[in-house]
A protein has these predicted regions:
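Alpha-helical transmembrane segments of multi-pass inner-membrane proteins
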Residues: 2-32, 60-76, 96-111, 128-140, ...
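Non-cytosolic membrane-interface motifs at loop->transmembrane helix junctions
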Residues: 117-128
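TM-adjacent membrane-interface loops and short helices in multi-pass inner/ER membrane proteins
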Residues: 212, 341-391, 395-397, 405-412, ...
Length: 482
């Protein structure tokens, strides 16, 4: 009797240990809650405004931290040391995890901005704390899910998540976003902020509950890979395999409508891996090969029709980007302007020079409000000043350029915004004591410089500008490897 009671208690304990993972898989991705954070320090220096409004990530990160603490507590109370000692694979995983954690902590200690390093920047919130959570979540899941029967506690939460995300995605594709409905306003918005909620018009693009379509790509590639394996598994019943296949196809439609090239590449690579793994079984039967080819062709054709050609367009774009990355254009010449109509401003003392695709415009400050204009050849440029609107407009070739004075301008101080076709590019500030210099939208002085870059020549726009990001990130890593 005691043995039965003990086994029953162990069963309950084991089932309870699955709960944090189930919540992490089925609930956390769906969490949306409006949160306002007042910014200070270096974050306020580079952020637009002194407040961050966050709907997608702040609440998720808080729940992740709470669930990770629960996981750590369960691990301490229930997992035996003998289990860890006997598992050779786990030992290797622990070594790798400790190396990652060690470098992360060391990097945080060396950081000049420890608050950002620890808690992360606005919107993402992925600093040291969340990275530690990710590692602990991974280790906990590995330790808790030991038997084949335990797999259902991963499978069913992901089915639930996929269905809910699928409904949200469908509503966004149809332009009837569920997240814009009144009942969602009640869930997402605290009482004091309910009046500031405005429905989002995404134009039919898909972002689910993940803030951006690129994150939809990451989500979809994981879900599709997972359910593709289950669809091909002989250990699952036929009705369930049909459900898995339906989730795979429907998630694929959402992925295509999200226009995430990274997600499509991820799915493509995982499907290639699956093909290699199952190739022996597939090629044993000609009927199976024929059936598989027909299934793939039908799925691709239907998906392309449903998405109105987006699948084909995205696939072509991926190959074009891949060619740019793998094959350097021999005719490519580095252009620091990147085709911007206004690409630089140099300011010092009584002179500011605006560099545009139409030529160079020099501004001479006699004082803060008495300006004279010349071109690169020092020839005068005709300018018309509107006293009511406090702006300067110019004769050709600078007719698309406009300078707008701030309402606080005087003979000793002025701020001038540089517009090109109604878009602001730079702000010039002038004081009697210091002359002319550039300021950002927060009012901080800076000098406009070309960022050092490394690699990705002619392919900087590949993968949603990831080529540009990496080409500017690599020099930073080389300078600060830890």
């Amino acid at each position: 009797m005691r043995k039965k009671t003990k086994n029953t208690n162990n069963t309950y304990t084991k089932k309870i240990s699955f709960v944090p993972v189930i919540l992490m898989l089925a609930v956390v991705p769906l969490i949306l809650r409006w949160h306002v954070t007042q910014l200070d320090g270096p974050i306020a220096r580079f952020w637009i405004g002194t407040y961050e409004t966050n709907l997608y990530t702040y609440a998720k990160s808080i729940v992740i931290i709470i669930l990770t603490i629960i996981m750590a507590t369960f691990s301490f109370l229930t997992i035996k040391k003998e289990t860890i000692k006997k598992d050779k694979t786990l030992k290797l995983v622990l070594i790798g995890s400790c190396v990652f954690i060690g470098f992360s902590i060391f990097s945080t200690i060396l950081s000049d901005h420890k608050d950002i390093a620890i808690w992360g920047a606005p919107e993402r919130r992925e600093g040291l704390v969340l990275h530690l959570c990710y590692i602990l979540m991974f280790l906990y899941t590995y330790l808790v899910y030991q038997d084949k029967e335990d797999f259902r506690y991963i499978k069913y939460p992901l089915i639930f998540l996929s269905v809910v995300m699928g409904l949200i995605g469908l509503s966004q594709i149809l332009g009837k976003d569920i997240l814009n409905m009144d009942f969602m306003n009640d869930i997402m918005m605290p009482n004091e902020y309910k009046d500031v909620f405005t429905p989002q018009n995404t134009g039919g693009s898909v972002y689910l509950t993940l803030m951006h379509s690129n994150y939809v790509g990451s989500y979809a590639s994981i879900i599709m890979s997972f359910f593709a394996v289950l669809t091909l598994s002989n250990h699952e019943s036929t009705p369930m395999r049909i459900i898995y296949g339906a989730i795979f196809v429907f998630t694929g439609i959402i992925l295509i409508n999200a226009n995430s090239q990274a997600g499509i590449v991820g799915v493509g690579v995982s499907m290639l891996a699956l093909f290699i793994i199952y190739s022996k079984k597939i090629f044993k039967s000609k009927k199976l090969v024929t059936a598989l080819l027909l299934f793939v062709l039908a799925t691709v054709s239907i998906t392309n029709i449903v998405t109105k050609g987006l699948l084909l367009d995205n696939t072509i774009d991926i190959f074009v980007d891949a060619k740019k990355v793998l094959v350097k254009d021999p005719n490519h010449k580095y252009d620091p302007t990147y085709g911007l109509p206004v690409y630089d401003v140099k300011a010092s003392k009584s002179l500011a020079t605006i560099y545009t695709k139409d030529g160079e415009l020099n501004i001479y400050f006699k004082n803060a409000t008495d300006l004279q204009f010349t071109d690169s050849n020092k020839k005068p440029v005709e300018a018309i000043y509107n006293k009511d609107q406090k702006n300067y407009k110019f004769a050709p070739p600078f007719q698309k350029l406009m300078l707008l004075e701030s309402s606080e301008s005087s003979q000793e101080f002025s701020q001038i915004a540089v517009y090109y076709e109604d878009f602001t590019y730079y702000i010039i500030e002038y004081t009697k004591e210091e002359g002319a210099y550039l300021i950002d939208s927060q009012g901080y002085r800076y000098e406009n410089m070309i960022a050092p870059h490394m690699g990705f020549e002619s392919s900087e726009r590949a993968g949603s500008m990831r080529g540009y990001i990496w080409s500017r990130t690599l020099p930073l890593i080389a300078k600060n490897p830890i």
